[in-house]
């Protein structure tokens, strides 16, 4: 806390730093690996350059292979106890899936097969422990029944198809639980600050897209 500085409209105190810097956030590997894969997929002329990044790709995937089974703080940087967040598992699947595809691009089929097999294990794990029959929806974590907007990202990253009834039901459940006055909350579980009290803009756009891809175009427009 910097007591000697003021912010916008003389607001005080100024705070610096972020307690999340030391957290384990397993979802981050998926975003990075998807970015690397999409870059080379969309710019095939740069395929030879993949070799320059191959060591980094192997390092990332080695970590994912080791850590995907472990609890983490999740996409929202929860400061409480580490949990098995469904969205983190999904993004670990993304990392392994994209790594397998990159390995295939380089004809490194041993790596591709190994990573794809591990991706299949993650997929089955999520389907077994993330889907809740009682809710007829995926839930925020393996051990709770809360809704989370990040579940809407399962389809755009290719983890589940838009026409899969489980995704359709999850979209509906997330919307029912988290949409308030036209805006989406991130989740409805308590964190270290209590229950969420404000919306999160990007989550509203995730919902709009999700409604559109499951065929609810009128709802998406509203």
What does each model-found stretch correspond to?
Residues 1-23, 59-71, 119-204, 222:
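Extended glycan-interaction surfaces of carbohydrate-active proteins
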